Amino acid sequence: MAAKIIKFDQEGRNAILKGVNILADTVKVTLGPKGRNVVIDKSFGAPLITKDGVTVAKEIELEDKFENMGAQLVKEVASKTSDVAGDGTTTATVLAQAIYRQGSKLVAAGHNPMEIKRGIDKAVETIVAELQKISKPIVDHKEIAQVGTISANNDKTIGDIIAEAMEKVGKEGVITVEEAKSMDTTLETVEGMQFDRGYLSPYFVTDPERMEAALENALILIHDKKISNMKDLLPILEQTAKSGRPLLIIAEDIEGEALATLVVNKLRGVLNVAAVKAPGFGDRRKAMLEDIATLTGGLVISEEVGHKLEQATMDMLGRAKRITIDKDNTTIIDGEGKEADIQGRVKQIRAQIEETTSDYDKEKLQERLAKLVGGVAVIKVGAATEVEMKEKKARVEDALHATRAAVDEGVVPGGGVAYIRTLSALDNLNLENEQQFGVTVVKLALEAPIRQIADNAGIDASIVVDKVRNGKDAFGYDAASDEYVDMLKAGIIDPTKVSRSALQNASSIAGLMLTTEALIAEKPREEGAMGGGMPGGMGGMGGMGGMGGMGGMM
């Protein structure tokens, strides 16, 4: 086991503070509308230019192991805030630096760090409650666009596209961000339920020009096993042929004789039929088939529940107004399932989302929910160069998260004003002894975001803070236009969830760092010790000359 170096007390806290400052000072130059860019060197390809706090934070690794601990802990603040709220990473970093910097001064002066931490925690609880009081719900298109615009660094086109996407697919809908092949940023929406399985044979195509199979007023047979034997399918095919309606078969797979017979009957014009594989894998496949059945008012024909394919009847089939199938995707539009059944299924999926701890499972459940109730929108991000495309795509993703957060918990005045407005709540918070110092730390830290926005805009921060403090409600400083305005009317708003998460995560990590009394890191190895013994020992390799005899092996 390698030897360790240990630092105690103030020496350790100073090393952490140095690391915190290096990371925070690099990240905070990006804050606000007049925030600057950071250029990151990449080992391959062009350098990355970004104004995204978490992207900058992730790139920072320091040589000194103790300083690096401080940097990594603040990096955790940024990434945790990004995970929860999707934005506010720079604000969280600025707050963490301010809380730790103020707190470590008090600890150095001999105050009890545990009591200070308790005071910080109580002050943050009070501020979070106050933020929720001044929060304002957002509903209309214009407000959603404003949140998106601000989070995308004041890019109005991105804000408008996100608002349009949310309007089309609803609160539960899935919105994905992809790179476009052109220079324009566009929005594509998919109506109904779409899953990523295309037709099993190109002979099912009804529109050769678009290479698409379109089935109007169709029936849907849903089966959870492979179909390879035609005789199992015959009874239900005869019944659907009599009805004259087109049929879509969704099964684990359709192969051999069964697929060949379907294709032949399709080509002869006896049956208007198409077949696709079931989406997903394992348990998720079963769940998705149930979703399709619920949406279309059919049943999953499964031996697990006592249904055999050869005994299937017309009332087990789902129904939809229109189905389109291309080589990659199947889209079911206007399924004829009962509204009550669909809502019951939605409720069930929502409960699963609440319970699951896995981010991957949560994402997949969210997708299923969207397919049942909302729809799917794709924002295709276009730009002139790849460097710009990557930067723009990161901004769109940030803005999308922030907008979702705003719809969830409402908005507060932006530009650091909300934190200033909540300060008055701390005036009434009287705690015992040294806990009151924790309240003072939070009071000073809450000014840090607005100060940094003013600094980045090249304005005297103290004057800005003073003016905003003396104002009321949403009165604040608009750094983009260098004016004092009503932030809500000017559309300068932050999602409450972002402001709340940034403060909670910053105070949590800063509090832990304050109560740290010892740091342990591995002792760096000396270069000389590593290289000293090697060359001499290698001399014995001369004996390898005998390998010449290996030629005979060939």
From Swiss-Prot:
Keywords, comma-separated and alphabetical: ATP-binding, Chaperone, Cytoplasm, Isomerase, Nucleotide-binding
Binding site for ATP: 30-33, 51, 87-91, 415, 478-480, 494
GO biological process: protein refolding
Pfam families in the cross-refs: Cpn60_TCP1 (PF00118)
PROSITE patterns linked to this entry: CHAPERONINS_CPN60 (PS00296)
Broad class of where this protein is predominantly found: cytoplasm
Membrane spanning residue stretches: none
Listed CDD domains: GroEL
Lineage: superkingdom: Bacteria
Subcellular localization(s) per the UniProt record: Cytoplasm
Function: Together with its co-chaperonin GroES, plays an essential role in assisting protein folding. The GroEL-GroES system forms a nano-cage that allows encapsulation of the non-native substrate proteins and provides a physical environment optimized to promote and accelerate protein folding.
Assembly with partners or alone: Forms a cylinder of 14 subunits composed of two heptameric rings stacked back-to-back. Interacts with the co-chaperonin GroES.
Family assignment from sequence similarity: Belongs to the chaperonin (HSP60) family.
Record protein name field: Chaperonin GroEL
Originating organism: Pelobacter propionicus (strain DSM 2379 / NBRC 103807 / OttBd1)
Species classification: Bacteria, Pseudomonadati, Thermodesulfobacteriota, Desulfuromonadia, Desulfuromonadales
